[in-house]
């Protein structure tokens, strides 16, 4: 994935192109054939979408902005219909304002129509509180590589042979002692600062939708657990977003986010953040038992 859609090319667009071409067995910079495929697949860049009635169940304009004030809030919801629609269509509030104008964007209500990127929507209504994704005979064997330098998460299928093509190092270096298999997915990610990165080999131990979260200011700042904590409920604007995949390294996981536009552009306290639309798709590729290599 290229990250959130803003109508402009950037580093994550390039990395998405390189990864897709690699998946197809082509040189990373094979733009001509990629553009032809894209134009055949997506006839129109934009579409018109209606704000669904169910959106009102996920909006709380009075949601506190400070983590320490979220205790007791039942749902960590979106703060506006604009935010709901931006995440639903993999973009930013600013880009929807650019496409539709401030008056329309800020005045959104259920039933209103909005110009959006032409992409399959992220359906928050399909996420269930506490739903666990269990081990899977195939998906639990997949390998994950977290490239902390380039801020990407790669998923490999060892049942498919590795495709060796010129320029693979432009995506991620292959220095493993054993073959990882074919690269089948790439997600942009936010990683921690160097002091919080735990290089090595781990495993996915659990994967749960709409997780609750414990705000521990001391742990986020130092990596050591404190006693002054706040229990935070689930929701799309929870700091861990719509999914938590815990690793065998205690306290560390791959999870969603409350701020998709910062993915790959900020730092975490040690975990690996995905946009909520990518986090929702993650269990289609990975289940508990999968190996995780942090580079």
What residues fall within each predicted segment?
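Extracellular LysM carbohydrate-binding repeats and other cell-envelope/extracellular binding modules
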Residues: 8-58, 94-134
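Solvent-exposed, acidic/flexible segments
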Residues: 2, 6-10, 14, 74-79, ...
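Primarily a LysM-type cell-wall glycan-binding module
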Residues: 1-2, 6-12, 48-90
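Extracytoplasmic/secreted envelope proteins and their assembly/folding machinery
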Residues: 14-18, 82-83, 93, 97, ...
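Secretory/export targeting leaders with adjacent low-complexity proregions
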Residues: 74-170, 186
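Sec-exported extracytoplasmic/periplasmic mature domains
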Residues: 1, 18-26, 87-104, 119, ...
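Exported/periplasmic cell-wall-interacting domains
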Residues: 103, 217-295
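Gly/Pro-biased beta-strand-loop elements
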Residues: 128-255
């Amino acid at each position: 994935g290229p990250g959130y859609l803003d109508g402009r090319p950037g580093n994550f667009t390039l990395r998405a192109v390189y990864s897709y071409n690699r998946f197809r067995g082509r040189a990373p910079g094979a733009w001509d054939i990629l553009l032809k495929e894209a134009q055949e697949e997506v006839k129109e860049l934009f579409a018109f979408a209606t704000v669904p009635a169910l959106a009102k169940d996920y909006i709380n304009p009075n949601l506190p902005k400070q983590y320490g004030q979220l205790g007791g809030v039942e749902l960590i919801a979106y703060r506006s219909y604009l935010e709901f629609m931006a995440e639903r269509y993999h973009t930013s509030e600013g880009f929807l304002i650019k496409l539709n104008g401030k008056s329309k964007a800020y005045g959104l209500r259920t039933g209103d129509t909005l110009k959006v990127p032409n992409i399959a929507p992220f359906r928050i209504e399909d996420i269930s509180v506490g739903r666990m994704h269990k081990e899977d005979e195939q998906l639990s064997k997949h390998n994950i590589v977290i490239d902390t330098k380039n801020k990407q998460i790669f998923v490999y299928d060892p049942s498919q042979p590795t495709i060796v093509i010129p320029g693979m190092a432009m995506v991620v270096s292959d220095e493993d002692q054993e073959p990882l298999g074919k690269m089948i997915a790439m997600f942009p990610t936010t990683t921690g600062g160097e002091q919080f990165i735990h290089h090595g080999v781990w495993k996915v131990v659990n994967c749960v939708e709409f997780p609750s979260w414990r705000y521990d200011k001391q742990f986020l700042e130092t990596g050591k657990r404190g006693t002054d904590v706040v229990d935070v409920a689930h929701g799309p604007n929870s700091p861990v977003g719509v999914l938590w995949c815990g690793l065998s390294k205690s306290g560390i996981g791959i999870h969603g986010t409350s701020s998709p536009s910062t993915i790959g552009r900020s730092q975490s306290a040690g975990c690996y953040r995905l946009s909520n639309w990518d986090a929702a798709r993650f269990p289609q590729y990975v289940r508990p038992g999968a190996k995780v290599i942090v580079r």
